[in-house]
Regions:
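C-terminal transmembrane bundle of multi-pass solute transporters/carriers
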Residues: 4, 25, 31, 45, ...
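Membrane-water interface of transmembrane alpha-helices in multipass transporters/channels
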Residues: 54, 58, 125-130, 208-210
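Generic alpha-helical segment signature
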Residues: 75, 155-159, 244
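Juxtamembrane intracellular "pre-TM" segments in multi-pass secondary transporters
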Residues: 145-180
Length: 353
């Protein structure tokens, strides 16, 4: 489990800094297609080796490394590409829909995988993954995107490009504070993200259906939240939307901590799922609006690194504490601090857009 976690996070973090430079330097559409294609080829090789009888856990780890690296390129590339093809007034709607689709996939994937594995081999699931990837690449191929090639950036080394990104972040105080807020909140919500299965087992029972229900209610809520933010569009001031979602998240974390019965816990978990895209989507749109297009790749790569590091860092803090205190206590106190973050955003003038 530890090795798979490292394989899933480390390459994504390691490649993101360089990926940001590449995304700002080359055609973003091609970067997305290339990363998806590399992942598909790695999965195809894995499926072929499994079919020949060569089945090794290390093969899975290697492919997981490649998939993680591909995600480290693809995710910031998608966020950087969206402003190129979407009018500014529709950014919130499109990013909300994108968030909803991602959450819906998370919601449906476990059930779909279980259904496929009940009637077919694991190799079949690998081939299905390759086919869906090729389908996605084909859709991306036909989308018309204005060429984005930064000739000036091509003349500089990757390290110079990374240095430029950090210099840009240092000079833009609002963006720096926004990313710092994201890191702090992600650390604080890590108990709700990772420790709730432990809470369910300790407080409500270790039956598998309870753990499944816990995961599915959050994913369903996140899908609904993406639809909500896409339809609503948020407040005219993006930071007010983020602050409201942050405050609700904190209150709902406290609700999780005091929920007396499992049904109430599931309701709070579903509502937390709704607040997540309402917090993340305005932040993404703000970066798309406020950051120079030539820096989109590098800034979104820094956000990717922040997200990838913050949750594990939170678990380094809250994991050992869960052996000393109940998860409920951790959720309540972390939720209070999340509320303080929301209050600071509203009351402080440091986040004025």
């Amino acid at each position: 489990m530890t090795i798979s976690t490292v394989c899933g996070f480390l390459p994504q973090i390691a490649i993101s800094l360089f990926a940001g430079v590449w995304i700002d330097r080359y055609d973003r559409k091609k970067m997305i297609m290339l990363s998806d294609g590399v992942i598909a080829i790695a999965t195809l090789v894995l499926a072929s080796l499994f079919l020949t009888g060569y089945k090794s856990i290390w093969l899975l780890f290697i492919v997981l490394l490649i998939r993680s690296a591909g995600t480290g390129v693809q995710t910031p590339a998608v966020n950087a590409l969206i402003p190129q093809i979407v009018p500014k007034e529709y950014l919130m709607k499109v990013n909300g829909i994108n968030s909803s689709i991602t959450s819906l996939i998370m919601f449906l994937s476990p059930a779909a995988s279980a259904a496929i594995l009940s009637i077919a081999s694991i190799e079949t699931t690998f081939f299905i993954d390759v086919i869906t990837a090729m389908f996605g690449i084909s859709i991306m191929f036909v989308i018309q995107v204005e060429g984005h090639v930064n000739v000036e950036s091509k003349q500089k080394s990757n390290l110079q490009g990374i240095k430029e990104g950090f210099s840009y972040l240092k000079e833009n105080v609002f963006i720096k504070r926004l990313i710092l807020l994201l890191i702090i909140v992600m650390i604080l919500i890590s108990p709700a993200a990772f420790l709730t299965p432990l809470m369910v087992t300790r407080s409500f029972g270790a039956e598998m259906w309870r753990l499944t229900a816990s995961e599915m209610t959050f994913s369903a809520g996140a899908a609904a939240g993406g639809v909500l933010i896409a339809a609503w569009g948020g407040f005219p001031n993006r930071m007010h939307t983020t602050a409201l979602a942050c405050a609700l998240y904190g209150l709902l974390m406290i609700g999780l901590g005091i929920a007396p019965i499992f049904t109430m816990y599931l309701v709070f978990n579903f509502l937390i799922g709704i607040t997540m895209p309402c917090f993340n989507t305005p932040v993404t749109v703000l970066l798309q609006e406020k950051v120079e297009p030539s820096m989109h790749g590098r800034m979104f790569s820094l956000v990717q690194i922040a997200n990838s590091c913050a949750l594990p860092l939170g678990m380094i803090i809250f994991g050992p504490l869960s052996d000393m205190f109940s998860v409920e206590v951790l959720l309540i106190y972390a939720g209070i601090f999340v509320l303080f973050c929301a209050m600071y955003v509203v009351l402080s003038k440091r986040f004025e857009v």
